[in-house]
Amino acid sequence: MIEKDFVVEGLRRTRIDEYLEKELERAGYGGMDVQVTPMGTMVVVYAERPGMVIGRGGKTVRAITQKLKNKFDLENPQVEVKEVDVPELNPKIMAHKIAAMLQRGMHFRRVAYTTMRRIMAAGAQGVEVTISGKIRGARSATAKFTDGYIKKCGEPSVKHVREGFATVQLKPGVLGVYVRIMPPDVVLPDKVEIEDPRVTETPAEEASEASEVVEDLEEVEDLEEIEDLEEVEDLEEVEDLEDTEAEKKDADGEESEK
């Protein structure tokens, strides 16, 4: 049945992931991806320190390849190692770092807050750290720490939120560490962005045409002012003529009276 094949393949991938996590814990194991190709099975391993995965002269990666072929029945397995760009945004790596700090005897609250600050400083939108086990006394308890914004349910939670888990053995008992991180590049479906109004700049040609129009208007205004001045001068000449004629008439009247 097809359903059974899917279940078997899922179980095999889970077993491979657990095996690689155990073998490459010191290398900062950050997850894996299995790709089936016509040439064989490509296993991509993500690690914080790829050199430790490859080993001296490729010894470690050859041993892992042989183990994947014999133990997990992978056809012609090819192991490719990739470095994790930002380890603080990988929940598997951060969960193992928390487990290592707890094993060194650090207080769980200090460990959680220090880790969350590092994750948020790397640009994450939100983070949730859960530590469960005998953290306070003889009885088991759970402490949950959150920072930022993180989806808890629905498709965005399954699709976008990354999860990582690690365990650590202490004297009181086993502690479980669960880390959930929402990366910075996640765009949620209910997010609305309001853009500022766009200011269109006037092209150079339109600006030159506008300046020419302004110059033409200034020339027209200058011409109108000149015409007004000429009209004023003509009026002054007419008034001068009228004054001289009036003076002549007054002089003629005085002579006739004499």
From Swiss-Prot:
Question: Do you know which SMART domains this protein is assigned to?
Answer: KH
> Where is this chain compositionally biased, Acidic residues type?
203-245
- An example of a Pfam family matching this protein is Ribosomal_S3_C
Q: Name one GO molecular function term.
A: rRNA binding
Keyword RNA-binding assigned to the entry: answer is: yes
Q: Which residue stretches belong to region Disordered?
A: 198-258
Q: Which domain of life is it from?
A: Archaea
Which BP terms does GO give this entry? translation
One GO CC term on file: cytosolic small ribosomal subunit
Domain KH type-2 residues, every copy: 16-85
Q: What are the entry keywords? A: Ribonucleoprotein, Ribosomal protein, RNA-binding, rRNA-binding
- Write down the Gene3D superfamilies for this protein, in alphabetical order: 3.30.300.20, Ribosomal protein S3, C-terminal domain (3.30.1140.32)
Q: What does this protein do?
A: Binds the lower part of the 30S subunit head.
Which family does the similarity line name? Answer: Belongs to the universal ribosomal protein uS3 family.
**Subunit info?**
Part of the 30S ribosomal subunit.
Query: What is the protein name for this chain?
Result: Small ribosomal subunit protein uS3
What lineage, starting at the top, does this entry show? Archaea, Methanobacteriati, Methanobacteriota, Methanomada group, Methanobacteria
